[in-house]
Amino acid sequence: MPTEYYIPASAIKALELLRAHGVQMRKTTVATKGLEQFAITANTQRPATNSIDTGSHGLRSLDGTWAATDVTAPIGSFAVAMNQKLARLAFYLLEPKSDDGLTAWNYLDDVLATEGVKSYPILRKK
């Protein structure tokens, strides 16, 4: 499990959902290096269906891998420490391959629905 996740300040819907669930975050005051980034190899948006599981919602799924990156989390990002009471919930919501997380429920579609996007917008520290 990572020690922290870094969420861009522009991911307003995702940040609001994390706050609503009680996940603790802090706004960063320095740029953070030594992170991992998820490289997307497949990005699939399922068509909306009217099912008991998803309502009339089309779930998104990603495939890819985490790898060390030179990308820096800028000042003003939101850090989610994974030594908190709700770490498991945070992990489930923030991991790109989670079947019921922010990606699946389209909370990051401002970035992920863009043609040709190659990287998950949330970074993590091992």
Residue ranges and their predicted role:
Residues 1-126:
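Intrinsic-disorder/low-complexity accessory segments
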